[in-house]
C-alpha cells in the first residue's frame, strides 16, 4: 500500500494556491503539508516539512522560482520539484532553464478564463506527474493508438530518443557526448507545448556538438542533425 504523497504548494497568488490545493486534496493519495507565497518561505518550509513534492511558481516576489530552485536542490535534495509556468516565450525560457537546474517536471498555467477548464487542465496534468515522480502505482493506459503507416521496404537508420520526467537535463547530458559527425539522423520526442520545444531545441543546440533544431513538417532527415 502506498503512503500519502506530501506536497508543498508555492505560489505568490493566493487564488492559485487555493486552486492547486483544492485540486490535490480531491486525490486521497496526496496530502498538502504546507503553502508558501514566495521563494524565501518555500526554502524554509521545505527544510521544516520535508515534502515529497514541491509545486513551484516561477514568477514571485522577494525570491523568484529559479533562485529558490537553486537553494532547494542543495538544501532539500530529496524533494521533487514541479515548476508552474505561464504559456509565454519568457515563461518557456525560464522553464527550460529550471529543468536544466534540476527541476523534475513542469505544468503550464492554464491560459483559459474559464475556472472549470483551468481546474480540469491542472488536474489532468499535475496529479499524474506528482504520482509518477514518487513512483506511486498508476493504472495502465488501456487506450490503443491507431496503427502506424507502413513504411516501404528498405533500411532506415535513425537514432530515436524518447524522454519524459527529467528529459531536458538527460537530453543535454546525452547530446554532449555525441560527436559532430554522428552518422545517422536523431529524432527526439519530448511532450511539451510548442513554445517550450522551441526553447528546448535552442538550449540543446548551444550545449551539443551536433546541430539541434525544432522539427518542421515535411523536413527531410539529415545525418548528424
Set out the residue ranges of the language-model regions.
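Strand-loop microenvironment adjacent to phosphate/nucleotide-handling motifs in alpha/beta enzyme folds
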Residues: 1-225
Amino acid at each position: 500500500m502506498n503512503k500519502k504523497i506530501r506536497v508543498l504548494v508555492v505560489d505568490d497568488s493566493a487564488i492559485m494556491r487555493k486552486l492547486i490545493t483544492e485540486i490535490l486534496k480531491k486525490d486521497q493519495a496526496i496530502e498538502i503539508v504546507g503553502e508558501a507565497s514566495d521563494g524565501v518561505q518555500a526554502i524554509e518550509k521545505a527544510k521544516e516539512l520535508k515534502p515529497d513534492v514541491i509545486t513551484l511558481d516561477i514568477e514571485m516576489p522577494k525570491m523568484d522560482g529559479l533562485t529558490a530552485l537553486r537553494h532547494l536542490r542543495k538544501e532539500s535534495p530529496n524533494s521533487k520539484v514541479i515548476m508552474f509556468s505561464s504559456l509565454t516565450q519568457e515563461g518557456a525560457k525560464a522553464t527550460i532553464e529550471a529543468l536544466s537546474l534540476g527541476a523534475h517536471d513542469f505544468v503550464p498555467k492554464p491560459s483559459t478564463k474559464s475556472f472549470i477548464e483551468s481546474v480540469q487542465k491542472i488536474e489532468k496534468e499535475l496529479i499524474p506527474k506528482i504520482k509518477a515522480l514518487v513512483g506511486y502505482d498508476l493504472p495502465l493506459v488501456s487506450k490503443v493508438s491507431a496503427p502506424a503507416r507502413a513504411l516501404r521496404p528498405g533500411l532506415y537508420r535513425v537514432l530515436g530518443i524518447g524522454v519524459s520526467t527529467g528529459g531536458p537535463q538527460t537530453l543535454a547530458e546525452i547530446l554532449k557526448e555525441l560527436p559532430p559527425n554522428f552518422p545517422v539522423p536523431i529524432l527526439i520526442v519530448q511532450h511539451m507545448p510548442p513554445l517550450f520545444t522551441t526553447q528546448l531545441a535552442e538550449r540543446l543546440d548551444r550545449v551539443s556538438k551536433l546541430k539541434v533544431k525544432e522539427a518542421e513538417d515535411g523536413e527531410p532527415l539529415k545525418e548528424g542533425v
